[in-house]
């Protein structure tokens, strides 16, 4: 049984200057016609903007009176010469973002299986947003990109616009169902360069914001691990924190996240603190405490490198002679005294290095203990450098007390391995974005570096050979090796000279002495300038692009109140109409003379004051008749219409959409609606009148931009049991090609067959509707 409830809600997509269309009375069926439809379905046909179709069936207009669709339960009619697919004209009109495009149906059939090819099918008017008044299909997409897409159908060549970002063009291609590999070669680099840059800059981002939010949710404020940025960007404590945790699906503990809030049920110490400690040592931008840890690590890195350099200065080196008594190799001879020269550094430098190693050891153990993936941790080059730089110090301390020859050999080797400590300088890449940009630039410019090496190798080989034979011209016949008049005694020595000359260094240790050798040297210098000048600008451009994007991401303000779009609704450009629902079964408590649905109900989560429309009953939830914050109601709204009266505003059906189907909206739309279950997160302040975002200049249109929608969730159980939960109707479960999510309603707890309104159990948390 369908139960209709009209609730007021703000529809932001309606224009402020549009006048609501006047309701048109529903045409009455003749006396010989079948029994009238139930009031809910008649009410659907009595919407504003209703007009009669050529076949006499009323068409209900969507919000704003823009789109017309057949009323559910009535036979479909031909929707114009283009929309119905039965017209004699071969042209079709497509309105994309307000720009009308006209083409032939045969043009759209050139790429079968795409979205535009689906417009030529007979059922296109029922699947897409078709307006019979203007005889066109409407898509709310980028009109400039669509011009290139339509030209691809006409010419068979897909070009990329230069004034559109690559990811946007990729998103539009995915929406229209076109493969990106069809882009022409002349536009491929323009199409790919932005995506390549973003892929390379993914590592510049801080750890996952959701993980940071989960880490702060469980009491990071109490632990002193959050700051003003974290509290504004990802903290979940405070008002509505529990609701946000549920929307983040964090109540039971996510992967790598805390099991719950501080002291939450079922939470463990490890699941609460593991992500926080990991972010404390890994991400310097996660909290104020993480910044302090990063500064401490940076300080010890600089001290360790300074100590390493001072150990080689003669002012910190002490040379001492130690006499060691050793047995004589000659039998019966007295022991021999052997004097050994030992080099020792200042003791305080050793102590300073020991303090630095203790800090690095503590940091390394904390990171390896609390890392989420130890295998990936051990694969990191920076972590390997940490381990290799720490081990020699402990081995040297442990072997310093031994006097055996093997121990001394190991100590000598460890002193040589001390140079590994200088590699700690690469740990600075965690704290400076410019160093990370440089590393990514070198990796992204690998092909250019290989090309540069090949050019240099060819030039070195050619000019080293030429300088060797050029210096032999005019040489003394008695000087076979040419050591008396030239430095180039062989070709391998000429390799060094060619490298120094081609890179324009010119050390001066080797130079030609003959006129022929000087000519070869001049050609070598010119070739080196041209060889290096070709690939270097590409490397510089890569660095400039990566660095500018990295700086832009750092300076980008945090979106604390990001607007999350709603699922496609009737009248939306991406809305696809469902199949007409079947007639509802007769109510068991009514006679055969007619079908009377139960009185409309309003869930308490909807927040609608119905005290003026329905008297209290035994099955009416008290929250329905109680206004204000206590009853979650909204005072001051007009009462709901009585059953059978036409809805004064445009209807809106609550449907459950298929998120997995990417055909109508594509992956970008599914990603945009990923958190639609929780629209209260990161949204602007809501108006207490209609639960709509408050924006400057929007208060004046609240009284005009309202709409109602139908809640079709009452279906009595045939076995007489009490139904709990929300069940979708069969007619809505077969909808294909929609994206979005279903609305979360409070559980039902009403025996079937009750003549009163369905009672809805009070929710444990405030409704997010």
Curated annotation (Swiss-Prot):
Give the record's GO CC terms. Answer: axolemma; axon terminus; calyx of Held; cell cortex; cytoskeleton; dendrite; dendrite membrane; dendritic spine membrane
Q: Please list the residue ranges that the record places on the Cytoplasmic side of the membrane.
A: 1-291, 372-380, 436-448, 541-769
List-wise, which residues carry Omega-N-methylarginine?
626
**Biological process per Gene Ontology, one example term:** protein tetramerization
Q: Where is this region: Important for normal N-type inactivation?
A: 1-80
Question: Binding positions for Zn(2+)?
Answer: 159, 165, 186-187
Per the record, the major location class is membrane
List of glycosylated residues: 321, 337, 484
- What does changing residue 593 to R do? No effect on voltage-dependent channel opening or current amplitude, but decreased rate of inactivation during prolonged depolarization
Q: One Pfam match, by short name?
A: Ion_trans
| Residues recorded with modification Phosphothreonine | 750
**What does the record say about tissue specificity?**
Detected on Purkinje cells in the dentate, interposed and medial nucleus in cerebellum. Detected in brainstem. Detected at calyces of Held in the auditory brain stem (at protein level). Isoform KV3.3B is highly enriched in the brain, particularly in the cerebellum, where its expression is confined to Purkinje cells and deep cerebellar nuclei. Isoform KV3.3A is not expressed in cerebellum.
The record's domain comment reads: The segment S4 is probably the voltage-sensor and is characterized by a series of positively charged amino acids at every third position.
Q: Which family does it belong to?
A: Belongs to the potassium channel family. C (Shaw) (TC 1.A.1.2) subfamily. Kv3.3/KCNC3 sub-subfamily.
Function per UniProt: Voltage-gated potassium channel that plays an important role in the rapid repolarization of fast-firing brain neurons. The channel opens in response to the voltage difference across the membrane, forming a potassium-selective channel through which potassium ions pass in accordance with their electrochemical gradient. The channel displays rapid activation and inactivation kinetics. It plays a role in the regulation of the frequency, shape and duration of action potentials in Purkinje cells.
List the protein's name.
Answer: Voltage-gated potassium channel KCNC3
Give the encoding gene's name. Kcnc3
């Amino acid at each position: 049984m369908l139960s209709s409830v009209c609730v007021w809600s703000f529809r932001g997509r309606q224009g402020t200057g549009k006048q609501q269309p006047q309701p048109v009375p529903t045409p009455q069926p003749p006396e010989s016609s079948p029994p009238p439809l139930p009031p809910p379905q008649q009410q659907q046909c009595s919407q504003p903007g209703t007009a009669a179709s050529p076949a006499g069936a009323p068409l209900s207009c969507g919000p704003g009176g823009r789109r017309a669709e057949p009323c559910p339960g009535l036979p479909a009619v031909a929707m114009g010469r283009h929309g119905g697919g039965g017209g004699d004209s071969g042209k079709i009109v497509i309105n994309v973002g307000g720009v009308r495009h006209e083409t032939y149906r045969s043009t759209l059939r050139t790429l079968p299986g795409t979205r535009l090819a689906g417009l030529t099918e007979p059922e296109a008017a029922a699947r897409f947003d078709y307006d019979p008044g203007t005889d066109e299909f409407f898509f709310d997409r980028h009109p400039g990109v669509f011009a290139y897409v339509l030209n691809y159908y006409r010419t068979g060549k897909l070009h990329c616009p230069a004034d559109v970002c690559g990811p946007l063009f990729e998103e539009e291609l995915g929406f229209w169902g076109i493969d990106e590999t069809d882009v022409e070669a002349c536009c491929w680099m323009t199409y790919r360069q932005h995506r390549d840059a973003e892929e390379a800059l993914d590592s510049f981002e801080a750890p996952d914001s959701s993980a940071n939010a989960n880490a702060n949710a469980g009491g990071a404020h109490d632990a002193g691990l959050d700051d003003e940025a974290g509290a504004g960007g990802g903290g979940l404590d405070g008002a509505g924190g529990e609701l946000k945790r549920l929307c983040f699906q964090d109540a039971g503990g996510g992967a790598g996240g805390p099991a719950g809030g501080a002291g939450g049920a079922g939470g463990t110490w490890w699941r609460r603190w593991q992500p926080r400690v990991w972010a404390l040592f890994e991400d310097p931008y996660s909290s104020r405490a993480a910044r302090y840890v990063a500064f401490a690590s940076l300080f010890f890195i600089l001290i360790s490198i300074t100590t390493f350099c001072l150990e080689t200065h003669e002012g910190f080196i002490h040379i001492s002679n130690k006499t060691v008594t050793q047995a004589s190799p000659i039998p019966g001879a007295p022991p021999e005294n052997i004097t050994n020269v030992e080099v020792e550094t200042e003791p305080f430098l050793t102590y300073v290095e020991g303090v630095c190693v203790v800090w690095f050891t503590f940091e390394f153990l904390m990171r390896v203990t609390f890392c989420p993936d130890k295998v990936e941790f051990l694969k990191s080059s920076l972590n390997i450098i940490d381990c290799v730089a720490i081990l020699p110090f402990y081995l040297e301390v442990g072997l310093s007390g031994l006097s055996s020859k093997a121990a001394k050999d190991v100590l000598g080797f460890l002193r040589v391995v001390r140079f590994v400590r200088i590699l700690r300088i690469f740990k600075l890449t965690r704290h400076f974005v410019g160093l990370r940009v440089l590393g990514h630039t070198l990796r992204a410019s690998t092909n250019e570096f290989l090309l540069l090496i090949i050019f240099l190798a060819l030039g070195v080989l050619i000019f080293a050979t030429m300088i060797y034979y050029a210096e032999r011209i005019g040489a003394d016949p008695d000087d076979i090796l040419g050591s008396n008049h030239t430095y180039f005694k062989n070709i391998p020595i000429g390799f060094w000279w060619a490298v120094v000359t081609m890179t324009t260094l010119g050390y001066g240790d080797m130079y030609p002495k003959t006129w022929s050798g000087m000519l070869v040297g001049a050609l070598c210098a010119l070739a080196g300038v041209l060889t290096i000048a070709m690939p270097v600008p590409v490397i510089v451009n890569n660095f400039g692009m990566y660095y500018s994007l990295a700086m832009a991401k750092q300076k980008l303000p945090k979106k604390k109140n990001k607007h999350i779009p709603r699922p496609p609704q009737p009248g939306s450009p991406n809305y696809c109409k469902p199949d007409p629902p079947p007639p509802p079964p007769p109510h068991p408590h009514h006679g055969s003379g007619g079908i009377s649905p139960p009185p409309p109900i309003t869930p308490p989560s909807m927040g609608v004051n119905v005290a003026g429309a329905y008297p209290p009953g035994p099955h009416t939830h008290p929250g329905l008749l109680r206004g204000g914050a206590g009853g979650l109601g909204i005072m001051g709204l007009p009462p709901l219409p009585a059953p059978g009266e036409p809805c004064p505003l445009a209807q809106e059906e609550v449907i459950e959409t298929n998120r997995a189907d990417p055909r109508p909206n594509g992956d970008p739309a599914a990603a945009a609606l990923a958190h639609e279950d929780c629209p209260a997160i990161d949204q602007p302040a809501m108006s207490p009148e209609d639960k709509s975002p408050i924006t400057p200049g929007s208060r004046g249109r609240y009284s005009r931009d309202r709409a109602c929608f139908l809640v079709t969730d009452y279906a009595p159980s045939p076995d007489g049991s009490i139904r709990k939960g929300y069940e979708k109707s069969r007619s809505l479960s077969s909808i294909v090609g929609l994206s979005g999510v279903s609305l979360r309603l409070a559980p039902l707890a009403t025996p079937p067959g009750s003549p009163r309104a369905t009672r809805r159990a009070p929710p444990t948390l405030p409704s997010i509707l």
